[in-house]
Amino acid sequence: MKNIRTKQTPCFRRWSRKGWAAFASLHRHVTIGVLAVTMSILLLATQHASAHDADTAAVLKTLRIDEVGISGSQSAPTRNVQSQTPLFDRKAQAAAPVQTLESALRLAPSVDIRERGGKGMQADIFIRGGSFDQTMVLLNGIDFTDARTGHQSHSLPGDIDCISAVDLLDGVPGVGAFAGAVNIRTAPLKLTYLRFEGAGGQHGYAYANLSGAVTSGRFSLLAAGSYRRSDGYRHNTEFANYNAFVRATYEAPRAGFFDLQAGYQNRTFGSNGFYAAYNPDQWEATSTALASLRWLKQAGRFSFGASASYRKNFDRYDWTRGTAMNRHNTDNVGARLWADYDWRAGTTSLGGDYAFNHIYSTNLGEALSRPHGRYTHAKARSTGNLWLRHAKQWRRFDLAASAGISLTPYGTSALWSLSGGYTPAPGLHLGIGAFQSMRLPTFTDLYYTSPAQINNLDLTPERAVTYLFDAGYMKNSWRLSLQTYYRAGRDIIDWVWREDMGDKWHSEQTSRLDTYGIELSGGYTVADGFLRRVTLSYGYITTDRNSDIIAKGAMDYMRHKAALAVEVHFLRRMSLALTASVYDRNGSYTHYPVPGDPSLSEVRDYEPYFLLDGRLQWEKGICRLYVDATNITDSRYCDLGGIPLPGAWGTAGVALTIGR
C-alpha cells in the first residue's frame, strides 16, 4: 500500500500518539482496507470526515504491527470533497438481511431508493430530495455517471459481497453532483480467498456468485462473477442479471501506485408498468462495460495523481415485448489530473478533469444525414473543470476552501466551496459548510419525444447552493450524529404537464426549488455478547417551490423516513438480524385500474408503508447458512407511479469461504 513502509520498530503496548502505536495496542494482526492519514476508517460511524479522509485505493494487506510505520495518506480523486457520510459498511452490517446494493442503501436516511421491480433490478437513487439525474455515481472514486439518463448510472457490475462501503460525498468539485455523490468502494473480504455463494427462493429466484482474491507482496487482485434471476412476482416482472468485475492494484517501488478496475453487466427484465403505468407489456435489456486506471505517486511534499476511465452502455426498450422502440448506445470517457503540496500553511491542491459524452440513438440527439447502423440520431459534448483548493488543520480546528471553473457547452461557470470544523472534546466534532453545484441537462432531458412527451432544446444547467451543518459523537460502542442542510435550487428541470400542448409532458425548468432536511442517527455496536448491534435513524425533508405546476418528479420526495436495525447472537453460532422501516412519501401518482387502458385513471396520494426484513444465520468455519425474508408483513406499497412492489419473499442460501 502506498505510503506504508516496512521497517523494524518496537512493538509498543499502549497509545503513544503514533500511527502504528494505535494498532499495536490491539496485540494482533490488522487487516487494513482503506487507510487515510487521519484514520477515517476508525471514525466512519461518526458520519464526519474532512476533505482529506476520502476513499483511497482499497488494497488489503496484513501487516505485523511491529513492522509498520505510517508516513502519510494516499490521495484519491475524492479527496477534495467537503464532507463524507457513511451509507453502508460491510463489516458492521455483515449479518444484515441485504442481498443487493439497493436493499443496503434503502435504510440510510440520506438516500431514497425508488425501485420498479424486485431485487433491485431497476431502481433509481435519489439524494436528499434531489432527482436521480442529480446524483453522481462513483466506483472507487471514479465517476461513471451516465450522461443519457440517471436510470442507468448505478447499473454497475459489483455484487454486495465485493462492496466494502458506500459513502455520500458533498461538495464534489465540478459538474454533476448537484444533490451529492454516491461513492461505492470495493475491497476483498480477506487477503487471499475463494468464495462461493448460492441462494434460491420464491418466484423462481436463483443466485450464484463466485469471487476471490490473491495478494502477493505489492500486488493484489480481486475478481467476482455472478448470476441472478427470477420468474417475477407478477406478470412480466421476470429478470436475469450477469455481473463480472475485476480490480487489480500494484505498488511499484519507484513508479508509484496503480489501480485498475474493469467490469461488465448484462440485464434483461420485464417492465410491467415501469415507464407507463397502464402498459403491462414493456421490456428492457441493458449491457454496461466499464474500466478505469488510476495512478498515485508521492515525492517529498508533493503528491501526484491521474486517472482515466471509460464506460459504454447499450439500452434496448420495447413498448411491447419483442418490438424494439428505443435503442441507445452511449460512450462516456473521463480523465483527471491533480497535485497536492503539503507545507506549513496546510495542503494546497490543484487539479482538472475532462469528460466526453457521446450517444447513438433511435430518437435522442440530432438527426444523422446517414443512419449509423440501426441508429438515426447522435450527439456529443465535452466538459472540463479546473479547481484550486486549500485546507488547514490546527489543534481542534480545520478549515478548507476551494474555487474552480467549469467549461461546458453552455459557457464558463464559477464554482466554490467553504467548510470548517471544530472538535471541542474527544469523540465530538462539529462541522459547517457551503458549496455551489450544477448539473447539465441529460440527453433525455433535451431530446426525448414520445406520444406523451415533448422535448426541449432550450434547457440550461441546473444550479444550487447548499448549506450544511453536522455534529457527530462517538464514545466506546456508542455513536450519535445529526446533519441538517438547506439547498437553494434554481432552474430545476422536470417534466411538466401542459394542457396547451395537447395534454402532454414537456421538459421545462421554470421553477425554483428550495429543500430543507434533517437527519438523525444513533447506534450501539459491540463484538461480543447477545446484543451485537442496534441502530436507529430518522430523516425529514420539506421543500418550497415557486409555482403550482403539475410536475412529474420534483415533489415526490421522501418526507419522513425512520429505520431500526437489531442484531443478536445466540447458541454460539446463530444470529438473527431484523430491520424495520417506515416511509412516508410526499406527492401523488396516476393509478390505472384496467391494465392497457389509459382512458380510465384516478389520482392517488402516496400512502405511508412499513417494511420488516429479517435474516436467520448459522456460521461455522468456512460455511455460512442463512434464511432471508423480505417484507415479512406483506405490505402493499410502491415507490414510483403506482407500480406494485413485491410482497413477502423468502429465500435461503449458503456461502463457503476458503482463505486467510
Name these PLM-found stretches.
Residues 275-299, 423, 429, 436-490, ...:
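Outer-membrane beta-barrel signature, preferentially recognizing the C-terminal barrel domain
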Residues 582-597, 617-660:
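C-terminal beta-signal and adjacent terminal beta-strands/loops
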Residues 392-396, 486-488, 509-592, 633, ...:
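Gram-negative outer-membrane beta-barrel transporters
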Residues 142-171, 185:
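Short acidic/polar hinge/loop motifs at secondary-structure boundaries
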Residues 62, 66-96, 123-124, 132, ...:
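N-terminal periplasmic "start-of-domain" segments of outer-membrane beta-barrel proteins
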Residues 230-237, 241, 251, 255-332:
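Flexible loop and strand-edge segments within Gram-negative outer membrane beta-barrel domains
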Residues 102, 106-143, 164:
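Extracytoplasmic beta-strand/coil segments of soluble accessory domains associated
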Residues 164-165, 173, 179-214, 225, ...:
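Short strand-turn segments of transmembrane beta-barrel domains in outer membranes
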